A protein has these predicted regions:
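Membrane-anchoring hydrophobic helices of lipid-metabolizing enzymes
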Residues: 2-107, 117-119, 126-130
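Catalytic core of membrane glycerolipid acyltransferases/transacylases, capturing the structured
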Residues: 47, 56-60, 105-161
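Short, flexible loop segments at the rims of nucleotide/cofactor-binding pockets, characterized by
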Residues: 81-86, 110, 158-163, 198-199
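Residue-level detector of flexible, active-site-proximal loop/helix-junction positions
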Residues: 95, 138-140, 157, 227, ...
């Protein structure tokens, strides 16, 4: 449910549903986006913003999560979302549009942040256990088994971002060649408004996704996440990237106790894939528009 790693192993029990549970104590010190910046002043500012916005609420959720115990692996995501009060309303018939076998790339817009990755994991895991999600590295260090479904994506300000990005792409391609599922947010950033009081806009989609699709021969399934982050986040985004980063824990709290109903589209047809075969950038622009236009 959060980006903090367990402090050590805990006994496994059974919650009555057949799902093993573990009563793990999480390290509160790692509950921060401040560690994504090396500069001590920037890190300090982010830590202070987090403390006065969403961190205390998230800490209370963690304590609740620890007391009730959590399933390990795939079941971790549903238990975490339940603790956060996030009910997923996507119907099973939409999830069944995800092919049961063969390489698949699932693409989605990115309106919220970490919560999008958690929802991705819960929904896709109901259909395909062989999925990997490309997500910011903070989300990969939670439950050890749940984190194994993630490929870390470095933040742009990471001094080693280029090397880590190359490794990430190689892992994703290898998984697709093995017939697995790779899910990602092609924009690479959370949607934000162009003005302080305008609507959040999904950023352009990276052409790397098109190259990955072409080289792997994977089927493509679009998914649209409704909603956007709070107005405070949109304003912060226009003021400073540090202020924006400091509000990411606040956005986790903002997402709590609200249902989410991502819309899963049908796999792209061969005709749709062929229409932009020689234009990766044009293909991604079309795929972005196609995904954002999905309706129930």
């Amino acid at each position: 449910m959060t980006e903090n790693a367990p402090t050590g192993p805990a006994p496994l029990l059974n919650d009555g549903s057949g799902e093993p549970v573990t009563f793990t104590k999480y390290d509160r010190r790692s509950l921060s986006y401040a560690s994504t910046f090396d500069h001590p002043v920037k890190s300090g500012i982010i830590s202070a913003i987090e403390l006065f916005t969403g961190k205390l609420k998230v800490l209370r959720l963690i304590r609740q999560f620890e007391k009730q115990g959590a399933p390990t692996g795939q079941g971790f995501w549903r238990a975490a979302l339940d603790t956060m009060g996030i009910d997923l309303t996507t119907p099973q018939e939409q999830l069944d549009r995800i092919p049961k076998t063969g390489p698949v790339v699932v693409v989605a817009n990115h309106p919220h942040g970490m919560v999008d990755g958690m929802i991705f994991a819960d929904l896709i895991g109901r259909v395909r256990p062989d999925y990997w999600i490309l997500t910011r590295s903070l989300l990969t260090s939670i439950d050890e088994v749940a984190g194994s479904y993630m490929i870390p994506v470095p933040f742009p300000h990471d001094p080693d971002a280029q090397r880590k990005g190359v490794e990430m792409r190689a892992k994703a391609m290898a998984h697709l060649k093995d017939g697995g599922v790779v899910a990602l947010f092609p924009s690479g950033v959370v949607a934000a408004s162009d003005t302080m009081f305008g609507p959040a806009i999904e950023a352009e989609w990276n052409v790397f996704t098109a190259k990955m699709i072409r080289r792997s021969g994977a089927q493509v399934v679009p998914m649209r996440f409704p909603g956007q982050n709070s107005r405070a986040y949109q304003i912060a985004n226009k003021i400073s990237p540090i202020l924006r980063q400091g509000l990411l824990l606040h956005e986790i709290v903002h997402a709590c106790d609200k249902p989410q109903g991502p819309i899963v589209g049908a796999p792209l047809s061969p005709e749709q894939m062929a229409a932009h075969a020689d234009d990766p950038r044009g293909f991604m622009a079309w795929l972005r528009a196609h995904t954002l236009a999905l309706k129930d």
